[in-house]
C-alpha cells in the first residue's frame, strides 16, 4: 500500500522500512500550500537531520523554507539558540533591501517593515503598560527592532503618546501619557486629517512637522 500523504510518514518510512539513517535524510520543501515551515519542522521532529532553507524564503514558485524561520523553529524545539546571533537576521534583511534592492513584503514575519508595527490604539496602550501584553517576544532584544506604531485614525491617544515617546527617545520619568496637552493636540490634529478624507497612515515627516508647530522647544529633541 502507498504511504499516506504525510511528511511524518515519509521520514518514518525511510528510516524504519528502508533503513536510511537519520544523518542521510534532509528535507527540501517549498511553500505551495503555506506549509513550508510546518513540513520542515515535522521532518526534523521525525528524524531528518537537516532541512534546506534559503534567505528570506526566496526560491522557485512560492519560495523555499525561510532560513530565518527555521532559526526560531530550532530555538523553540531545542530550547536554545546554541550561540546563534538572531540580530543578524535584521542585518541580512537590510542588506537585501538596501544593497540588492529586493522588495520584502511588509507583513513578512521577522523581517518585514510592518511585522511588529501596530496602528491600533488598544495595542499601543498595551505596549505602554507592558510590552509583553502585545508582543509575543522581545523584538528589540532578539532582532534589534523595537515594536513600534504607525499613526492613523485608529491610533487614539495611546498610539500618539507611544509614537512620541519612542521617536524622541523619552526615558521613564519624562515619557508623555494620554493626558499630555501635546498628545491631546496631536490626536485632535490627526483626527481632523481623517475627517477631511485622508486614507493613508501619517508619515513621520508630517508628524514631526506638526510637533514643531505645536511645541518648537520639544521638537528640538528629535
Language-model features, listed with the residues they occupy:
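Conserved, mostly hydrophobic/aromatic
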Residues: 47, 70, 164
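Active-site-adjacent beta->alpha loops and helix N-cap segments on the catalytic face
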Residues: 1-15, 61-69
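C-terminal helical cap(s) of enzyme catalytic domains, especially alpha/beta-barrels
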Residues: 59-85, 89
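Glycine-rich phosphate-binding active-site loops on the catalytic face of alpha/beta enzymes
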Residues: 46-66
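A mid-to-C-terminal "edge-of-domain" accessory segment
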Residues: 79-222
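Alpha-helix-loop-beta-strand connector modules within alpha/beta enzyme cores
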Residues: 7-26, 72, 78
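Catalytic cores of alpha/beta
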Residues: 33-48, 65
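Hydrophobic faces of well-ordered beta-strands that scaffold small-molecule active sites
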Residues: 23-29, 51-53, 70
